[in-house]
Amino acid sequence: MVKSLLKGIGDTKKVEKFYDDWSKNYEQSLIDWNYKAPRQSVNILNKYIKIKPKYLLDLACGTGLFLEEYSKLYPQCICDGSDISKKIIDISKKKKIYRKLFKTSFEKKIKSNTQYDVVSLIGAMTYCEDHQLLLKLVFSYLKKNGCFIFTQRTDLWEKLNFDKLLRKNSYFKIAHISRPLNYLPKNKDFKSNVKIRIVLLNKI
């Protein structure tokens, strides 16, 4: 499992099976590894966002850990989610925190009639194969002045020259890029070696 987490990008069917197999222990694993990205992301969003969001789309939503933190600050927001794993989605459904849940990869177009104030992608950018396509899709989901918040691992940030990629994109302007933050500090393979940056983009 850890090797798959480190590797990230792979065949979507393998990623789906990986998360289906992990689903029963998913939340406990992240607790054990001191995973704080959802809370950290919400804090950054709350600090920099200029609107009171009415609609959120939570891509690669997992079991709703980001939404649980987000809802503490924005309890009236209507939230939809998507994930590639059916078993993960089944867990989210039981929590009854999402209006709609879509079983699909975040790199495929979601068929929703809602225009969102915020789109989130927390802890899953590792699996993105086409970043320009993703930005284009997110742009299409958002209202004018909408926000896209996501995390990216620092090792992939450097490998992909991610700063340049963001600055060259024609869909968003950068609102905030965090300093490197611990990702899974109590995971023996990640520790403090692999960190994340949290990025907030505003729709142009």
Q: What is each model feature region?
A:
Residues V118-H131:
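A short SAM/SAH-binding and catalytic strip from SAM-dependent methyltransferases
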Residues Y35-K52:
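Conserved alpha-helix/loop element of class I SAM-dependent methyltransferases that forms part
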Residues M1-K24:
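N-terminal, positively charged/glycine-rich alpha-helical extensions of SAM-dependent methyltransferases
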Residues K173-I204:
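Class I S-adenosyl-L-methionine
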Residues L57-K109:
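Class I SAM-dependent methyltransferase SAM/SAH-binding core
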Residues Q132-K144:
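A short glycine-rich, Lys/Arg-flanked "PGG" loop and its adjoining helix->strand segment in the class I
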Residues N145-R153:
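Conserved beta-strand signature within the Rossmann-like core of class I S-adenosyl-L-methionine
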Residues K109-V119:
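A short acidic, Gly/Pro-enriched loop at the edge of an enzyme's catalytic core
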